[in-house]
């Protein structure tokens, strides 16, 4: 056991296949260079703190229950009993759909293992973090957790080990945060309800999505930005068909395309959250500045190969 341990877990974007992945198709997800830092200290009683602006405040809401429950499960898994102080520091925008809840779960598990000198495997971290995600989202696919644990770009099918996609070039994507809050579990239920109205159509779209994941994977590896953009536009149309768009995200997608992006789409659950877009690298900075002028949080992200990491200071 150590005085303090730290773990940093990246957030994520879904490049293609969200919602379809819940129903057996594949998705492509990527870690991003924004994430969650968790610090673990010994304490006289269990405490959870999180950053709000420049202050760290103790959280006493229902939102901390999954963290407390996850801490208990992780301690049981490693065979330890010790009250802990958990301090969460995030540079992922609130309610952005960029995987903050998954990253919190992943970083918490990893930091606890480091604190007690237990070498948790990636699979251990994934399984424990998923138990926390299920308490929040009900029936998550696991793709958010996998992206945070393993890093890089991954091809993911529910119930299978993720496959990492290795790219020679550095891909940079634009992220725009809509500011619209939504609940992932409700959107998953909405998608499931609408798809049940036309099961044959959904089955055809599910099969098409699985094939197009291969096309997107090839486009990412070959750095074919125009093809990546075209496939993004297709997937966004699918999500819109199932009622997962929002007037604000639609406006942001139209704006990004008008500024010269090859493609743009909702990322994650939809209904708000964030939009991702792709453009030539020399245009990215100008596009993000122009969108920020409209009052939206907008930034570019890189896709780090490294997933969760932990250390002691």
Task: Tell me the role of every PLM-derived stretch.
Residues 28, 92, 98, 156, ...:
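Short clusters of hydrophobic/aromatic residues that line enzyme substrate/ligand-binding pockets
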Residues 19, 52-54, 90-92, 270:
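Short, histidine-centered active-site or binding-site loop motifs used for metal coordination
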Residues 73-96, 128:
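Glycine- and acidic-rich phosphate- and metal-coordinating loops
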Residues 12-14, 20-31, 95-104, 140-151, ...:
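FAD-binding core of FAD-dependent oxidoreductases
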Residues 98-121:
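DPxDG-like acidic metal-binding loop motif
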Residues 2-14, 21, 37-77, 112, ...:
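C-terminal nucleotide
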């Amino acid at each position: 056991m150590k005085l303090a341990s730290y773990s940093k877990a990246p957030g994520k974007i879904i490049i293609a296949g969200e919602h379809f992945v819940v129903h057996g198709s594949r998705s492509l997800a990527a870690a991003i260079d924004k994430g969650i830092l968790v610090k673990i200290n010994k304490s006289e009683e269990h405490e959870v703190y999180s950053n709000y602006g420049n202050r760290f405040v103790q959280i006493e809401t229902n939102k901390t229950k999954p963290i407390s429950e996850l801490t208990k499960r992780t301690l049981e898994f490693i065979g330890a009993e010790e009250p802990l102080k958990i301090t969460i520091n995030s540079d992922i925008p609130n309610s952005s759909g960029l995987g903050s809840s998954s990253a919190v779960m992943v970083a918490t598990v990893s930091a606890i293992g480091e604190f007690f000198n237990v070498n948790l495997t990636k699979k251990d971290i994934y399984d424990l973090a998923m138990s926390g995600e299920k308490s929040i989202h009900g029936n998550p696919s696991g793709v958010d957790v996998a992206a945070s644990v393993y890093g890089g770009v991954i091809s993911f099918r529910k119930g299978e080990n993720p496959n990492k996609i290795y790219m020679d070039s550095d891909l940079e994507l634009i992220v725009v945060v809509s500011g619209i809050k939504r609940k992932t579990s409700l959107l998953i239920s909405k998608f499931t309800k609408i798809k049940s109205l036309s099961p044959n159509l959904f089955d055809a779209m599910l099969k098409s999505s699985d094939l197009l994941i291969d096309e997107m994977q090839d486009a990412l590896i070959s750095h074919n930005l125009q093809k990546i953009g075209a496939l993004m536009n297709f997937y966004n149309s699918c999500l819109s068909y199932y009622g997962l768009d929002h007037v604000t995200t639609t406006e942001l997608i139209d704006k990004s395309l008008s500024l010269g992006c090859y493609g743009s789409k909702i990322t994650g659950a939809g209904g708000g959250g964030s939009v991702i877009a792709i453009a030539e690298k020399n245009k990215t900075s100008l596009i993000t500045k122009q969108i920020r002028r409209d009052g939206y949080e907008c930034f570019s992200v890189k896709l780090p190969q490294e997933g969760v990491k932990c250390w002691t200071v």
